[in-house]
Every structure is written in C-alpha cells, then in structure tokens.
From Swiss-Prot:
Positions of Mn(2+) 1 binding: 8, 99, 102-103
Protein name in UniProt: HTH-type transcriptional regulator MntR
Keyword Chloroplast applies: no
Domain HTH dtxR-type: residue ranges: 1-63
Subcellular location: Cytoplasm
Regulation: DNA binding is strongly activated by Mn(2+).
Amino acid sequence: MPTPSMEDYIEQIYILIEEKGYARVSDIAEALSVHPSSVTKMVQKLDKDEYLVYEKYRGLVLTPKGRKIGQRLVYRHELLEQFLRLIGVSEENIYRDVEGIEHHLSWNAIDRIGDLVQYFQEDERRLEALRDVQKRNEQGE
C-alpha cells in the first residue's frame, strides 16, 4: 500500500493525465506546491514500486496498478467532498477538511460514507430532515 504522501502524488498524476493527457515533473510540482527535485525523488520511488514508469526527460506513465489506485483515490476525494457538502460543511473548509481526513479513513469507512451519500440522494426528504435537525440545533445554540 502506498503511504499518504505517495497517494497524494499518485492522485495528482492521475488527475493531470486525465485532464492533459500527460504529467510532467514541473506540472506535478506546481499542482502539489513542492520543489521539482522532491517530485523527481517521489516519482523514482513510485517507479521502483511499480505504480508508474518514469524515464528521465521523457515523462511518466501510470502502470495499470497506478491507474487503478489513482482512480480509487480520486473517487475517495470526490466522495468526501460530496459528503461534506451534503452535511452542510462550508465550501471554504471542504478542501482542507478532505485533505486532513482522507488518508486516515479505511476503505471500509469510505464505502460506508458512500452508502450514506447514496441514502440521502435516493430521497430528497431525508436531506430535508437533516437540514431541519441542523436548523433546530443552530437555533438552540
């Protein structure tokens, strides 16, 4: 299993490849706000661990293993954003909150959060009931 730091890189590489068709060290560095030399070190480690294939000055390609994990990491991130919006977390806090929790939840917990999001999406009245509870709690403060 990749470390949380490795996950951040794999996720970002996956996103860049999906958006642009490629991911360069400079693009990854800019997206993650890190120095290119840090990206090079991590990319070499990810290559060694067979998440991607890296050729200096030629770029990188995710392996099937790296693509699968990248896809799952993007799903996790998007699901957590969706969940936090659903429960009423303010938009300006969502990205930071997701970044703070995403590496600490098991995949079982992620799957259960997915179930909960689906539960609320299947019947608008459930979401309205949640909003009513939140409104009552805010008035009680």
